[in-house]
Amino acid sequence: MACVSHWLLLLSLASATLSRPLWSERNGLIEMENSIRLGGNIILTPSEATANQKLMTVKGAEFKEAESTGLFPPSMHFFKARPLIQQSHVFSILHQMPKGGALHLHDFAILSVDWLVKNASYMADCYMCLTRDGGVRFLFAKPAPVGMLPPGCSEWILLETYRKKLGDVTEFDKGLIRNLTLLTDSPEPHIPSQDEIWRRFEGAFITASGLICYAPVFKEYFYESLRELYEDNIQYLEMRAMLPPVYELDGTVHDQFWSMAIYRDMANKFVGAHPDFLGAKIIYTVHRHEDLAQVTEAVHLAMKLMEAFPEIMAGFDLVGQEDAGHSLYQLSDALNIPSKLGVKLPYFFHAGETNWQGKDVDENVLDALLLNTTRIGHGYALLKHPVARNLSLELNVPLEICPISNQVLLLVSDLRNHPAAVLMAEGHPLVVSSDDPSIFGAQGISYDFYEMFMGIGGAKADLRTLKKLAENSIKYSALSKEGKEKLTEIWQKKWDKFIKDLAMNWKKEL
């Protein structure tokens, strides 16, 4: 950055003394701008250079087609763009690319909802009730539940019996799937405001929780989530988890320590079967609607979980709609407790997930940094706070960019206009993730990589950009030095194979 400032100073001095445009400096300035872009300073190997040439040929062809048809997926709502992305050769390449770690995903919105409906809801003793607004709630019980109805719900219906009476079970299951996602063919008129989309968004979590919080489903859901991420060529997961009570048919209710032990054991089981996957860590979260006393209690619990599960517990965060919840400053007395006690509790705060400016909610980006956050979730408002932006750079605190989430939750419509476009151009530390892919109708993080590469990064984003994003996911993870080295080793082997396949085999006619 000092080099850039030096060049700009010389240019301004020259412009002050000369009346003619300094066209002789144009190429140098463009080259300088390209060099400071995210990944711009990476020197590609010969094989990577060949692979990059093929990648950019494919990307250029898709840009040209978009200009001809007027259909450019990053400029469209994801629900409409999704089938176009699935047909994209660029997307196919990104799916095959080893992406390192997925660092921003939420516990009950990782695995495709098809699995929940086609597997969990077909398990014995699964009951359903219908809400007044057309939604559903689930409960496992034996014998049949008496009472225990959520507000505004019908009587409990045993799904096994109900399905036997249906003429079209497939259509019924499609209806259940719709209740677990936000997918719609016409997103614009059906989603009028941020408050409404957040109401539906959190409703999908509530619906899913009735299935996932049943202990047998809880275990398999996490294992299958790891499998789906693995199939998307992800080598490591950091998952935000609220650790709600998990129940058994006999009435036993498990606490947060039980859930953490299950996450640890299932992750170890998956790694045992897939040694080219490093594992998972958990970021314990509570809702930002909770009051100071409740957050204080949660912080104390987080410290206990850190002590009990040092190998899998990564830290603490607050979740939920920022505009409607408490700000970090309002909860600072609770969040300052670990530092006052001399206890290490890393923070991974959601901050600045808002369109507002000059309110408590967008000042969360500054307060997150003052609270020594390890990463910033979303950070959509960071551009409006130059001091926080510079502090983030100085402290080397990355933003977790989740493009599809930001679009679906109505922060931005055309992803070419996402604030991360500016941050990428400046070389700001960033990682890519997918937040809640199952609710958005996505899987893994390849869809978000596509939006980042094609839309936010613009035409000049290339293999260096992708490599830097993957490397950042390792560099800025919560892993120890040894863990990062091991993950780098796993990723590098896969990266080298990916480059070889792309350079030598993929679309040989290019």
Curated annotation (Swiss-Prot):
Residues at the active site: E353, H378
Signal peptide: 1-19
Residues at which Zn(2+) binds: H104, H106, H350, D435
SUPFAM superfamilies: Metallo-dependent hydrolases (SSF51556)
Function as written in the Swiss-Prot or TrEMBL entry: Adenosine deaminase that may contribute to the degradation of extracellular adenosine, a signaling molecule that controls a variety of cellular responses. Stimulates cell proliferation.
Major place of residence: secreted
Co-factor binding details: Binds 1 zinc ion per subunit.
NCBIfam families (alphabetical): adm_rel
Designated name of the protein: Adenosine deaminase 2
GO cellular component: extracellular space
Enzyme Commission number: 3.5.4.4
Keywords annotated in UniProt: Disulfide bond, Glycoprotein, Hydrolase, Metal-binding, Secreted, Signal, Zinc
Binding locations of substrate: D107, W198, R199, R200, F201, E202, G203, A204, F205, H287, G320, D436
Compartment(s): Secreted
One function term, GO molecular function aspect: adenosine deaminase activity
Family under the similarity heading: Belongs to the metallo-dependent hydrolases superfamily. Adenosine and AMP deaminases family. ADGF subfamily.
Glycosylated sites: N119, N179, N372, N390
Superkingdom: Eukaryota
Disulfide feature: C129-C153
Record-linked InterPro entries: A_deaminase_dom (IPR001365), A_deaminase_N (IPR013659), ADGF (IPR006331), Ado/ade_deaminase (IPR006330), Metal_Hydrolase (IPR032466)
Other facts noted in the record for this chain: Morpholino knockdown of the protein results in reduced body size, abnormalities of the body axis, and changes in expression of developmental marker genes.
One biological process term in Gene Ontology: inosine biosynthetic process
Cofactor or coenzyme needed: Zn(2+)
Catalyzed reaction equations: adenosine + H2O + H(+) = inosine + NH4(+)
